[in-house]
């Protein structure tokens, strides 16, 4: 029997890719809604009542209002996966980054309220948590995270901005150091203070790279690039969607020596590169992913699969 799914916000950037993925999933059936009724609450409540799972791909405030109405009508029995940032640090919601730690998949399976991570947060936490969990860096460390994302991460307005005419190769934003992903990075990174987060948007549609540069001076004594790489290798060795390149590998670079943020488009994978200069005592960790894949709709499908006992990779990849 197919799992009945309703996507609220299926016409948005994340919603469209989520729908594309779910159409390829052999275990689900999508509940449709007429375009002229998609903002009609009473009509949506009828669709919610039919659904085993509700995906929310809405702006934050709309998501909060919709969850309120679902709770009022159905209590906590309906399974919700929220792709917005509205509930990412709320009590009663489980954080939908399955690779966060060894217990996270169980937490996702055992709840009816799953909040999908932000795309930047996914990359940042994949780099930070192994270091914190193994006491390599202190929870009070001042971290500096740099990142670049394709412009689809900014939704329809940014897509229109970059699509209409030639634009700069990339642009910095969130210059007041208040990006909305910071709270979840700090909370789930187990950090005592916000990192300095410097995001930018590139003149390409999809793909992203999140990087964490560190000095060995900030770490416990006797650390080296090889030891850090071994920690990451052990942490992610059983994770299907996280790959780790060999230490200081040139194979992940283009022939010109560049590291492209666009290698995983259409997938739910996250790739980690570690570059270490033990002589200078510096290390650079870089996570790459598709901002609309592992950073959004792919992760949402993965969380659905975990929740309902399907194979974890079913429907997570878009066909080219």
Question: Which residue stretches match the model-derived regions?
Answer:
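C-terminal helical cap and adjacent loop that interface with cofactors, partners, or active-site loops
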Residues: 237, 261-320
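Predominant activation on well-ordered alpha-helical scaffold segments within soluble catalytic domains
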Residues: 19, 68, 125-132, 182-186, ...
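Residue-level signal for pocket-adjacent positions within structured domains
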Residues: 90-95, 103, 168, 196-199, ...
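N-terminal Rossmann-like NAD(P) cofactor-binding subdomain of oxidoreductases
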Residues: 2-167, 173-174, 275-278, 314, ...
């Amino acid at each position: 029997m197919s799992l009945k799914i309703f996507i609220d916000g299926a016409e948005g950037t994340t919603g469209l890719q989520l729908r594309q993925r779910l159409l390829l999933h052999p275990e689900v059936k999508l509940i449709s809604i007429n375009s002229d009724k998609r903002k009609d609450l009473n009509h949506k409540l009828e669709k919610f009542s039919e659904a085993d799972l509700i995906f929310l791909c809405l702006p934050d405030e709309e998501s909060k209002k919709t969850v309120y109405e679902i709770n009022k009508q159905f209590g906590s029995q309906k399974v919700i996966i929220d792709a917005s940032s509205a509930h990412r640090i709320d009590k009663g919601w489980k954080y939908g980054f399955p690779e966060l730690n060894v217990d996270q998949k169980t937490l996702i399976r055992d709840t009816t309220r799953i909040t999908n991570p932000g795309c930047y947060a996914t990359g940042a936490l994949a780099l930070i948590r192994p270091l914190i969990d193994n006491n390599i860096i202190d929870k009070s460390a001042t971290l500096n995270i740099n990142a670049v994302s394709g412009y689809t991460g900014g939704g329809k307005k940014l897509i229109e901005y970059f699509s209409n005419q030639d634009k700069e190769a990339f642009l910095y934003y969130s210059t007041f150091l208040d990006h909305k992903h910071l709270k979840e990075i700090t909370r789930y990174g187990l950090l005592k203070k916000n990192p300095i987060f410097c995001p930018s948007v590139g003149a390409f549609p999809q793909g992203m790279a999140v990087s964490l540069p560190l000095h060995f001076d900030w770490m416990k004594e006797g650390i080296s690039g090889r030891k850090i790489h071994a920690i990451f290798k052990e942490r992610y060795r059983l994770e299907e969607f996280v790959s780790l390149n060999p230490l200081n590998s040139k194979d992940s670079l283009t022939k010109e020596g560049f590291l492209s943020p666009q290698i995983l488009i259409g997938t739910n994978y996250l790739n980690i590169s570690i570059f270490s200069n033990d002589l200078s005592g510096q290390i650079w960790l870089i996570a790459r992913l598709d901002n609309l894949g592992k950073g959004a709709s792919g992760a949402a499908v993965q969380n659905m699969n975990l929740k309902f006992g399907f194979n974890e990779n079913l429907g997570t990849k878009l066909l080219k």
